[in-house]
């Protein structure tokens, strides 16, 4: 594709992102049981919304956080994220299925999942104290054609569903799962990357004795990270997934 056409396509998609729908985690399946997430397009309008395993947010526009908020609490569990009151039990070593609402196919980027121990009750933990370790990440899968195939494309192909395995080595206890899409369609400009962090409470049973070292949510990213400030409308020889290294325990 000619460079002029690539530039034009980038501009069109960046403009479209202002009006295109975005998404959020509507439910998860853990230990074979379905749990409703925080329904950001309906629960905020209820006087007494149902309790959920998903953290509440005020992102009723289904919008995003960007690089200007990487040192702000909003990047941790989305806009004004507030503790979920329920937790989903899950066996260490088992899989959790995460269901998103329909994700726009123009919003290419990585899908990343973290855990953080609450060291107690996740319904009351101070989110600014949570230290996240990365348990799953899929970025650029294939770049044989611009803009490439990404984790988001894999998610869409699976019916807007993502499956992640809880490490079998981590200690039993209460954890916040921070599951996130970073859309890169406008990321060639500083603060153009769009973060969609979603937090959910898990009660991990079984497991080992692992207590992975984590990173505070407000220190996960910098707006100049190579996986954040990147032009996906050029051929990429390599893509570095943002955030700390993947937990290998």
From Swiss-Prot:
Catalytic function, reaction form: [(1->4)-beta-D-glucosyl]n+m + reduced acceptor + O2 = 4-dehydro-beta-D-glucosyl-[(1->4)-beta-D-glucosyl]n-1 + [(1->4)-beta-D-glucosyl]m + acceptor + H2O
Needed cofactors: Cu(2+)
TM spans (from-to): none
Pfam families tied to this protein: AA9
UniProt-annotated binding residues for O2: 185, 194
Any single Gene Ontology cellular-component annotation: extracellular region
Cystines in this chain: 77-199, 118-122
CDD domains recorded: LPMO_AA9 (cd21175)
Stretch forming the signal peptide: 1-21
Main enzyme class: oxidoreductase
Sugar-bearing residue positions: 34, 80
Any one GO biological process: cellulose catabolic process
Primary localisation category: secreted
Any GO molecular function: metal ion binding
Function of the protein: Lytic polysaccharide monooxygenase (LPMO) that exhibits a mixed C1/C4 oxidative cleavage activity on cellulose and xyloglucan. Catalysis by LPMOs requires the reduction of the active-site copper from Cu(II) to Cu(I) by a reducing agent and H(2)O(2) or O(2) as a cosubstrate. Shows a higher boosting effect with cellulases on the enzymatic saccharification of complex lignocellulosic substrates associated with xyloglucan than on the lignocellulosic substrates without xyloglucan.
Similarity comment text for this entry: Belongs to the polysaccharide monooxygenase AA9 family.
PANTHER family noted in UniProt: ENDO-BETA-1,4-GLUCANASE D (PTHR33353:SF34), PUTATIVE (AFU_ORTHOLOGUE AFUA_1G12560)-RELATED (PTHR33353)
Entry note about domains: Has a modular structure: an endo-beta-1,4-glucanase catalytic module at the N-terminus, a linker rich in serines and threonines, and a C-terminal carbohydrate-binding module (CBM).
The name this protein goes by in its record: AA9 family lytic polysaccharide monooxygenase A
């Amino acid at each position: 594709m000619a460079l002029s056409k690539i530039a034009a396509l980038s501009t069109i998609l960046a403009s479209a992102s202002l009006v295109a729908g975005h998404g959020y985690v509507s439910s998860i399946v853990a230990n074979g049981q379905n749990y409703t997430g925080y329904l950001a397009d309906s629960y905020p309008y209820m006087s007494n919304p149902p309790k959920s395993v998903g953290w509440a947010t005020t992102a009723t526009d289904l919008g995003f956080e960007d690089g200007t908020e990487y040192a702000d609490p909003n990047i941790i569990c989305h806009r004004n994220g507030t503790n979920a009151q329920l937790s989903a039990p899950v066996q260490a070593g088992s899989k959790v299925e995460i269901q998103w609402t329909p994700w726009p196919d123009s919003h290419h980027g990585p899908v990343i999942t973290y855990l953080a121990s609450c060291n107690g009750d996740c319904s009351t933990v101070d989110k600014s104290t949570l230290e996240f370790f990365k348990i799953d990440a899929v970025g650029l899968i294939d770049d044989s054609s611009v803009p490439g195939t990404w984790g988001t494309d894999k998610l869409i192909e699976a019916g807007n569903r993502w499956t992640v395995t809880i490490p079998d080595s981590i200690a039993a206890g209460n954890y916040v799962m921070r599951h996130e899409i970073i859309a890169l369609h406008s990321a060639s400009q500083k603060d153009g990357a769009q973060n969609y962090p979603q937090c959910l409470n898990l009660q991990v049973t079984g497991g080992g004795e692992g207590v992975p070292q984590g990173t505070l949510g407000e220190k996960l990213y910098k707006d100049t990270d190579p996986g954040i400030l990147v032009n996906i409308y050029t051929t990429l020889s390599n893509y570095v997934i943002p955030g700390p290294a993947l937990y290998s325990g």
